């Protein structure tokens, strides 16, 4: 909104020209979301306490988690709220990717809110039946897949050459490719157009990431810390993908409107940092499914929009491992005579059962997350 208001006035005041820069507005989005959470979280936490919106802890989980019973949950409300306000202020509101990201965040947060509310109301950990959560996630995934397959025309492959006469890089080939194309990390010349199959693929990405973050949200600061790390990597990827010169130099697809996605990612980072202040061990508040389902979903959507879907496996490796641990545990239990691969799933509980303290698990997973995020960014040069 600020861009639409102030940038047209740049000739009246030179400072308004700053609003044209993605980096300036991204920094503004980070700061705004961070400040909003820091300012309003204490009041929201007190309100949640008065409403008795406390965490319901599974009785089959680690015994050390029983002390968390009653800790205010649904803190994702002020994460989502601060992101929405920050994006409203700093992003170009006529950018369709921003609109879809915002709508997706709202829809998935509604699903998460219903899940949290039912857990609190009935004082158990069941919440919204899984089929309904999958419905919300699938609905969002299909919308994103349909948009990218049928309507999005923003993906280009560009080749530049040095003009020896003037010593300047010039575009010699600009080729539009379908947004249903997936690009392989480490290989600049290998890409596959999934065509109509991109819709179920996009749906799978959204559903998987939404559930992966949800499953990871079991220790103080774990899910939100990893989200900050992953969002920082996505900010780099979205910025370079939206810059034609950098994208061409790195031999990655140029997404003509991806730069604006960086502003949205900035809001994620700011809100995440603010929430971590209150969610660090011992947590004063939990994000609940209103936060984890929605934030995980938009991480997947961002990767789809900037055409780095497959890099999710690398930069989101901890989330992927957490989700896979649950899938493998259930599969092994059902089909191999009730045998368990892990002491407890998700994976963070396995390490708790192995004697690691909660803070050890969290910080060691952070370290792995940082390493994998750096590897993901490094793939930009290994092509």
UniProtKB/Swiss-Prot annotation:
State the family it belongs to.
Belongs to the glycosyltransferase 4 family. MraY subfamily.
From which source organism is this entry? Answer: Brachyspira hyodysenteriae (strain ATCC 49526 / WA1)
Membrane topology label: Multi-pass membrane protein
Q: Which reaction does it catalyse?
A: UDP-N-acetyl-alpha-D-muramoyl-L-alanyl-gamma-D-glutamyl-meso-2,6-diaminopimeloyl-D-alanyl-D-alanine + di-trans,octa-cis-undecaprenyl phosphate = di-trans,octa-cis-undecaprenyl diphospho-N-acetyl-alpha-D-muramoyl-L-alanyl-D-glutamyl-meso-2,6-diaminopimeloyl-D-alanyl-D-alanine + UMP
Its required cofactor(s), as named, are: Mg(2+)
Q: What is its EC number?
A: 2.7.8.13
What pathway does the UniProt record associate with this protein?
Answer: Cell wall biogenesis; peptidoglycan biosynthesis
Q: Which domain of life is it from?
A: Bacteria
Its job: Catalyzes the initial step of the lipid cycle reactions in the biosynthesis of the cell wall peptidoglycan: transfers peptidoglycan precursor phospho-MurNAc-pentapeptide from UDP-MurNAc-pentapeptide onto the lipid carrier undecaprenyl phosphate, yielding undecaprenyl-pyrophosphoryl-MurNAc-pentapeptide, known as lipid I.
**PROSITE patterns reported in the protein's UniProt record:** MRAY_1, MRAY_2
Q: What is the designated name of this protein?
A: Phospho-N-acetylmuramoyl-pentapeptide-transferase
């Amino acid at each position: 909104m600020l861009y639409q208001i102030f940038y047209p006035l740049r000739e009246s005041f030179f400072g308004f020209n700053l609003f044209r820069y993605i980096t300036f507005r991204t920094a503004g989005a980070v700061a705004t979301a961070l400040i909003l959470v820091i300012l309003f979280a204490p009041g929201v936490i007190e309100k949640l306490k008065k409403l008795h919106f406390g965490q319901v802890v599974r009785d089959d989980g680690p015994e050390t988690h029983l002390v968390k019973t009653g800790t205010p949950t649904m803190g994702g409300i002020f994460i989502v709220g601060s992101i929405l306000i920050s994006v409203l202020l700093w992003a170009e509101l006529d950018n369709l990717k921003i609109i879809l990201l915002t709508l997706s965040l709202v829809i998935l947060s509604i699903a998460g809110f219903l899940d949290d509310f039912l857990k609190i109301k009935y004082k158990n950990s069941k919440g919204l039946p899984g089929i309904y959560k999958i419905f919300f996630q699938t609905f969002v995934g299909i919308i994103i897949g349909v948009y990218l397959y049928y309507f999005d025309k923003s993906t280009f492959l560009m080749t530049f050459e040095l003009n020896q006469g003037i010593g300047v890089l010039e575009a010699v080939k600009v080729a539009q490719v379908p947004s249903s194309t997936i690009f392989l990390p480490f290989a600049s010349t290998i890409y596959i157009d999934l065509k109509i199959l991109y819709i179920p693929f996009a749906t799978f990405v959204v559903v998987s990431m939404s559930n992966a973050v949800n499953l990871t949200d079991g220790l103080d600061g774990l899910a939100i810390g990893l989200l900050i790390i992953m969002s920082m990597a996505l900010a780099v990827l979205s910025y370079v993908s939206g810059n034609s010169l950098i994208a061409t130099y790195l031999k990655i697809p140029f997404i003509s409107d991806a730069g604006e996605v960086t502003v949205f990612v900035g809001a994620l980072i700011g809100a995440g940092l603010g929430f971590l202040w209150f969610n660090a061990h011992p947590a004063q508040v939990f994000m609940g499914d209103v936060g984890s389902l929605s934030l995980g979903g938009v991480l997947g959507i961002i990767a789809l929009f900037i055409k780095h879907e497959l890099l999710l496996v690398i930069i989101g490796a901890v989330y992927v491992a957490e989700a896979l641990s649950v899938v493998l545990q259930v599969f092994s239990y059902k089909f191999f005579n009730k045998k368990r691969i892990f002491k407890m799933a998700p994976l963070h509980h396995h390490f708790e059962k192995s004697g690691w303290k909660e803070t050890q698990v969290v910080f060691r997973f952070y370290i792995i997350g940082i390493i994998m995020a750096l590897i993901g960014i490094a793939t930009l040069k290994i092509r």
